[in-house]
Amino acid sequence: MSTANPTANARVSVQGTQDGDRIATDAAPTNAGAAPTRILKADLVIIGAGSAGLSAAAGAAMLGLNVVLYEKGEMGGDCLNYGCVPSKALLSAAKVAQTVREAGKFGIGASDPTTDWEAVKAHVHGAIATIAPVDSQERFEGLGVTVIREHAKFADKKTIVSATTRTTARRIIIATGSRAFVPPIEGLHEVDYLTNETIFSMPEQPEHLLILGGGPIGMEMAQAFARLGSRVTVVEMHKVLGS
């Protein structure tokens, strides 16, 4: 596959296609480094405040356990910020555009829809903001969970350290999630490519979107942007949506 310098309106989106294509992050054992200033003991430490980590934290806290939750990024993880919520909000906007486009089939006159990308982004980020309080630091602290918004590292099999805190726990859950697999395609890193972490904040809607990966996420984005008026090309080395 050859690559060329992208035009201002041509974008590449990289999507993981299988679980095996995704890379766990943030929990590799390492040296503790400088001494933290706060020492904690807990029944349970959870690394990662995405769907899995928050569910575990809420359940454990409700059972009366002393829970410490580490998260270096956004509360809510991929699902709230870069996955389920924004993708479904984008799909809902795209469905409205397609409904208007097909109104003539039902005897209803309508002009071809135009897309206000800034308004679409506002709809997407409004959906995130509506759900965010459920996953917020304040809510979990209200449940009795100690939330530490720092990068977590293993000091030993029972101890987690961050910039300010050292926590020893009976049990540790690694719920660090994943990130999009970036395939080793020559020239790809010379392109301003997109992933699920950046596609919902693009300054402009692309005229042409090339999606690498025909899994569920890739095909969701393909349908949404095609319905919103972009030209879309999907590249998949196996079968679209798997076998």
Region locations from a protein language model:
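Rossmann-like NAD(P)H-binding beta-loop-alpha module
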Residues: 203-240
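N-terminal Rossmann-like FAD-binding beta1-loop-alpha1 element of flavoenzymes
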Residues: 42-69, 211, 218-227
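Conserved acidic residues
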Residues: 50, 151-153, 215
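Residue-level marker of alpha-helix boundaries and capping positions
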Residues: 47, 126-127, 212, 243
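Glycine-rich flavin
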Residues: 2-6, 10, 14-42, 58-65, ...
